[in-house]
Design a protein with these regions (language model features):
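Charged, low-complexity intrinsically disordered terminal segments
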Residues: 1-233
Length: 233
């Protein structure tokens, strides 16, 4: 109780001394009701980990009825991860992922691995959208149907799956799902859909980032020299 009293007094003192800096905002008016919130985490020990977050996200996505939409900066998968996506694609009518294009990706390892494995990703049945916004996209979120939202630090890569201690917040709320979708669509309007023949569907008339010769050389160099260590990136 003493600590709480000290905290309240400290806040009141700060408020009186900084009135002009404090905005007049009632944050309660800007919140949404939720049915449930859960935090999903990988184990916290150092070294290799059981892919807890991947398993749990996979089960959530497999149980979707209509759609799953993923945003991730990087895609670096192994067989187990590709198989999870195949299962989701077989069950869910609308299954898509947005990631950086090869030219737009700020991570040379992620860019090189994606360039090499793009067709394999497509073969899982997932629709790929490539972001061309001019700066490397770094959002990590998932929409499941119209009521489930997942936001956090997890990339769709092996490092997040097996090495890092990642967190994802799972929220059941139609209002938050709608708000998150609006934010995600702002980026998708600067993206193009990759088709199976290597061409693009471009409903938003996006100007793609140029894949320079220097960038192409760097991609090839990383593929040849560091492909063996792809799970680290």
């Amino acid at each position: 109780m003493l600590f709480r009293s000290e905290l309240q007094n400290g806040y009141q003192k700060y408020f009186e001394e900084n009135k002009e800096r404090i905005c007049d905002t009632n944050y309660t008016d800007e919140t949404f009701e939720t049915e449930k919130i859960a935090l999903v985490s990988n184990p916290i020990h150092t070294g290799p980990k059981e892919p807890v977050v991947w398993y749990q996200l996979g089960e959530l996505m497999k149980n979707a009825k209509e759609r799953v939409k993923i945003h991730t900066p990087y895609i670096i998968c192994n067989d187990m991860m590709y198989n999870t996506w195949k299962e989701i694609a077989e069950r869910v009518p609308d299954f898509s992922i947005m990631t950086n294009s090869v030219a737009n990706n700020g991570n040379p390892f992620g860019s090189a691995d994606y360039a090499r494995n793009r067709n394999r990703i497509l073969n899982t049945g997932i629709d790929i959208w490539e972001y061309e916004g001019g700066y490397s996209y770094h959002g990590k979120s998932i929409l499941i149907d119209d009521d489930l939202s997942v936001i956090g630090s997890f990339n769709m890569d092996m490092r997040s799956t097996y090495l890092d201690t990642e967190l994802m917040l799972v929220i059941r709320s139609k209002e938050i799902n709608k708000q998150l979708e609006e934010g995600m669509m702002e980026y998708e309007r600067v993206s193009r859909q990759v088709l199976e023949d290597g061409t693009y569907r471009d409903p938003y008339h996006v100007e793609p980032i140029e894949l320079t010769k220097k960038r192409q050389r760097n991609v090839l160099l990383v593929q040849h020299l560091l492909g063996w260590a792809r799970y680290l990136f």
